[in-house]
Amino acid sequence: MTRRTILRGATIGAALPLIGAPLVARAAEIELKYGNNLPLSHPLNIRSQEAADRIAKETNGRVEIKIFPNNQLGGDTDMLSQVRSGGITFFTPSALVIATLVPVAAINAVGFAFSGYDQVWKAMDGPVGAHVRQAIEKVNLYAFEKMWDNGFRQMTTSGRPIESAKDMAGLKIRVPVSPLSIAMFKALDASPASLQFSEVYSSLQTKIVDAQENPLPIIQVAKLYEVQKSCAVSNHIWDGFWFIANGRAWRGLPPDVQKIVAAAINDAGVAQRNDIKKLNETVQADLQSKGLAFNKTDPNSFRAKLRDSGFYKDWQERFGKEAWDLLEGSVGKLA
C-alpha cells in the first residue's frame, strides 16, 4: 500500500497494469497493487476486477486497486517476495506456493483427503482454514477469510485407464516439484518424475512419461488430449488460492476501508468458486469431444493404499497433530 505522493515517484516508467479500478472523479487517496499469475480471462481476474470496482465505489474513490495479471510482476517466487516486502499489497499464491514459506498451508493438498467440494469448503472456510490463516499471519502476511478455487487435479494416461490404486504400480507419471505430491505417488507405487510444466507435452509425446496430473482447464489449454487417451476423475488433490496482503500495509488501512476491502474480496472469492465449477463442466465436455475418455475411480482403494504405506502417518507428523486433527474433523479418519 502506498499513498499517491509516494507512489508517483516510485512508479514512473513502470509498466501500466492491464486492468484496474475504474476512473473516479478525484484522485484516489490510497493505491493498492495486486499481482497474480493468471490471464485476464480467468475467473480469478474477472472476479478480482469486480471487487476492485466495488471497493472504488464503496469508498467513493478513496481506494484504487491496480491489478497486474499474468505474471507481469514476475513469477510466484518473485511476487511472494514482493508482498512480504511491501512492494505489492496483494498476491494470490496457490496453497502449494505459500507452503514454501508456511509449510502447514499445504495441508489441503493431502492426497485423497477430500471427497468433494462440500468437504473442501467445510474445512477451508472452517477450522482448517482458520489454522492456516493464523500460521500465515505469523510471517507478517494477512490472509482473507475465503479461499479461492484452483480446482481438483485429475490423472491422464496414454495407456490403460486408472480405476483403482493397483493401476498405479510402475506408472511413469509427471508431477510438479512438490514434496507432498512426489511422496503420494511413490506411496502408490508409481514412478513420479518432477518435470517443468513446459516439458510435459513433449515428455508425454516421446514416452519419457506415460501419465500426468493437472486440473482439467490446464489439460485443455496445454492440449494434452493430443498425447493422452484417458482421464481418471480422481480428484486426488485439491488446491486453492489464498488472497493475501502485506501485513503492515493491511494494518495501516483505516478500519472502514479494511471492512469494505475484506467484504468485497471475500464475496468475489465465493463467486469465483462457482465460476470454476461451471468451467470444469464445460471443459470436460470439450475434452470428451476431442477424444479424451473419462472414467471414475475408486477413492477408497487409494486411501487404503496411502494408509497402509504409512503416507498419512508420515504427513500427520510433518503437519503436526493439531492441524491434522482439524483436517480429519472435516473429512474423516485418514491416518
Regions found by a protein language model. Give the residues of each.
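N-terminal secretory/targeting leader peptides
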Residues: 2-19, 24-119, 127-335
